[in-house]
Design a protein with these regions (language model features):
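Alpha-helical oligomerization segments with coiled-coil/rod-like character
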Residues: 1-77
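Domain-scale macromolecular recognition modules
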Residues: 74-123, 127
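Extracellular/periplasmic catalytic domains that process cell-envelope and extracellular macromolecules
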Residues: 84, 99-100, 116-117, 144-146, ...
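Terminal peptide-recognition signature
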Residues: 108, 122, 185, 203, ...
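A structural signal for short beta-strand/turn segments enriched in small hydrophobics and glycine
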Residues: 116, 122-124, 179-191
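Zn2+-dependent peptidoglycan hydrolase active-site motif and core
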Residues: 118-172, 178, 199-208
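Short, charged beta-turn/beta-strand-edge "cap" motif at the junction between a beta-strand
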Residues: 130-132, 188-196
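Acidic, glycine-rich catalytic/binding loops that coordinate metals and/or anionic ligands
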Residues: 177-180, 205-256
Length: 256
């Protein structure tokens, strides 16, 4: 009798183990399938983003937010960048998402309302806040460039090299305007969740303009408001691959 009960218990344990292993296998297959779907979705979103941002912009629709060629100021050279987002942590690195899909900048996760400061002294090339601070979702193409939501791009000089630095997905609290000079560490905006965004963060891109003069850079941006500085939105022209300036820098090189 006792032996029969033990056999039954052993059989039940074996059956339960087999069922558990089967459930684990199914869960693993579902996770793998989900990850593939996420990767494909990220790739599609990145491709659509590149297409939308490559489209010719109607300058009359954004002229009020773009620096004028009448700017004749100088930019103080500083010895290095400082961290622009005053809190939070890195959530996605540059060139590609961990789950797949092109990603051309550094994502810094921080609560909506976190201070964003000028990483170096410079001048604001573009600043606009057309949408709500926490209005972002994937596939939301509001703002300029498309999907950027509330955005800023500034020009700065670090150790004699001219850089353009972009900030996307900001809140509506933007404290600067095009043509305004700013000092390193000055608060220029608050972080948000606007445009093509899955959560509160600031997307940062850095462009190395080499020995381009401030006046030439201002004139070039004023003419076409090209946030990508001729590098496009498909991932080419990176500085680390040896491309000549203007080229895309990996923001992690300066901000960590």
């Amino acid at each position: 009798m006792q032996q029969d009960e033990q056999k039954r218990l052993d059989a039940d344990a074996k059956s339960q183990k087999a069922e558990l292993e089967n459930q684990k296998k199914q869960a693993s297959e579902l996770e793998e399938s989900y990850n593939k779907l996420v990767e494909e979705y990220q790739k599609q979103i990145a491709q659509l983003e590149a297409e939308k941002r490559s489209a010719q912009v109607d300058m009359s629709s954004i002229r009020d937010f773009v620096i004028s060629t009448s700017f004749s100021g100088t930019i103080e050279s500083v010895s290095g960048f400082i961290q622009p987002v005053q809190g939070g942590s890195k959530s996605a690195g540059t060139w590609a998402y961990a789950s797949g899909g092109l990603h051309l900048g550094l994502d810094w996760a921080a609560p909506v309302g976190t201070s964003v400061v000028a990483p170096a002294s410079g001048v604001i090339l573009y600043a606009a806040a057309p949408v709500g601070s926490n209005s972002g979702y994937l596939g939301n193409w509001t703002g300029y460039p498309a999907g950027g939501g509330n955005t800023i791009q500034m020009l700065c000089n670090v150790n004699g090299t001219l850089y353009a630095v972009s900030f996307f997905h900001l809140s509506q609290n933007i404290y600067v305007s095009a043509g305004q000079s700013v000092s390193q560490g000055q608060t220029i905006a608050l972080s948000g969740n606007s445009g093509n965004s899955s959560g509160a963060h600031t997307h940062i891109e850095v462009y190395n303009l080499g020995s381009m003069s401030v006046s030439d850079a201002v004139a070039r941006f004023s003419a076409g408001a090209d946030f990508a500085w001729g590098t496009g939105w498909s991932g080419g022209s990176t500085c680390e691959a040896g491309s000549a300036a203007p080229c895309r820098e990996r923001p992690e090189k300066f901000f960590s």
